[in-house]
Design a protein with these regions (language model features):
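C-terminal structural segment of proteins
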Residues: 1-174
């Protein structure tokens, strides 16, 4: 977040609470199975909290459930210390289903649920998921990149993430 000096002061709770569109942290936790506890609002899924309008409630804690999954996160930046052009977090559940989260689009992060396709080879699965996300995602433009560039990156990062997670699965099976 911002520069190195401020990044060393940033907290997970602050990043989750603010729900910034460029947050790497929010993108990663949205791919996981998480809830948040709000002082007035009680416990609710992080996915629901991330879509809510801003309010003045206090974030008490982030609850990370111990759901078995493989997770892979990546981002594209114009420079190492810059905020991201696009972020991607992918989770492969034990069932083979996928949860892909795309952030810094530059809108708030969005999550896609994709069903398992056991009949497809890893390369085909990755290409299919990448095309699906490119067709569905809404991106915007700013000084870091155009909407078209971000849409293209969403497909590329999704494909890389699925290939990585499928490769991990094959290594575990050996």
């Amino acid at each position: 977040i911002v520069g190195v000096q401020l990044r060393n002061l940033a907290t997970v709770g602050g990043s989750i609470y603010s729900r910034f569109g460029f947050s790497d942290v929010l993108t990663m936790f949205l791919a996981m199975d998480c809830d948040v506890e709000l002082y007035k609002g009680g416990i609710l899924p992080l996915q629901e909290y991330a879509q809510r309008p801003y309010d003045r409630d206090v974030l008490v804690r982030l609850i990370v459930k111990k759901t078995p999954m493989q997770l892979y996160c990546q981002s594209v930046r114009n420079s190492q210390t810059d905020i991201p052009v696009l972020t991607c977090a992918a989770a492969r559940m034990e069932t083979g289903d996928y949860r892909i989260v795309i952030g810094a689009r530059p809108l708030r992060a969005v999550r896609f649920e994709l069903p398992a396709e056991p009949a497809l080879a890893a390369e085909q699965l990755a290409a299919q998921f990448a095309e699906s996300i490119k067709a569905q995602i809404v991106t915007g433009s700013n000084m870091r990149g155009s909407a078209e560039y971000r849409k293209h990156l969403a497909g590329v990062l999704t494909k890389r993430a699925v290939l990585e997670l499928e490769q991990r699965k094959m290594q575990e099976e050996k």
